A protein has these predicted regions:
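Basic, helix-initiating cap at the start of DNA-binding domains
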Residues: 1-34, 38-47, 63-67
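Short secondary-structure transition hinges
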Residues: 104-141
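Hydrophobic/aromatic-rich alpha-helical bundle segments in the mid-to-C-terminal region
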Residues: 115-119, 126, 148-194, 204-208
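Hydrophobic alpha-helical connector segments
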Residues: 68, 82-109, 159, 163-166
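Short, basic, alpha-helical segments at the C-terminal edge of helix-turn-helix-like DNA-binding modules
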Residues: 71-78
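Short, Lys/Arg-enriched C-terminal cap helix and immediately downstream tail that follows
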Residues: 67-68, 202
């Protein structure tokens, strides 16, 4: 697969085309649940009940379909995080909890078969890691800075360090092999990791 840009472009108007949108939705459900390496364009066409000609009229290859699935997924992540981070009147603990719950919810969708396939596509995997890092740094970094100024996060722990710890925790949560070793699932692992991280960075005031 070709090298991807680190940022996501604004979704094009053609994504609003009902057939194209249906292709993306069908591929998303299948890819994220069962993986994508064993799926052909023929399989997608059959599953959608459309001709290969129609499928290829919208996407030139499976790689393009996969890229659009990821584009759509991270567009939703960005919109949700932005909405929660900019909520007026919400306290620091409330906003942090909401952001973490949002992140956990989005991490539930990609299943181990997808992650295994993705790890065999180094450039695409690196692109996803970059997209994830950008969003966590932007939304959580800003919130951690606010919490630090309010005396809710320890001043001796730089927000950048907290971000790296959180990113490392997420990498562990979505690594199928690591989860198998720990006998955990993403659903059970994420709360454990988050609780451990937060207990280490919050002040007594932040925990109260």
């Amino acid at each position: 697969m070709t090298r991807q840009s680190a940022t996501l472009a604004t979704p094009s108007d053609e994504n609003a085309h009902p057939v194209r949108a249906r292709i993306i939705q069908h591929a998303r459900q299948h890819f994220l649940m069962h993986g994508f390496r064993g799926v052909s364009m023929d399989d997608l066409a059959v599953g959608l009940g459309i001709s290969k000609k129609t499928l290829y009229a919208h996407f030139a290859s499976k790689a393009e379909v996969l890229k659009e699935v990821i584009h759509t997924k991270f567009g939703e992540v960005e919109a949700d995080l932005e909405r929660l981070a900019s909520a007026d009147g919400a306290s620091f603990p409330s906003r942090l909890q909401q952001l973490l719950e949002c992140l956990q919810g989005h991490l539930k969708e990609p299943q181990p078969p997808f992650m295994r396939d993705m790890q065999r596509e180094p450039e695409m995997f690196a692109w996803i890691q970059t997209l994830r890092r950008e969003r966590i740094q932007r939304h959580f970094g800003k919130l951690f800075e606010e919490g630090r100024r309010a005396g809710l996060i320890r001043k001796d722990v730089p927000p950048k360090v907290v971000i790296e710890i959180l990113l490392g925790a997420i990498e562990a949560v979505i690594n199928p092999q690591k989860l198998e070793e720990l006998e955990l699932t993403p659903k059970t692992a994420f709360p454990i990791i988050v609780t451990t991280v937060l207990q280490g960075i919050l002040t007594d005031k932040g925990r109260s």
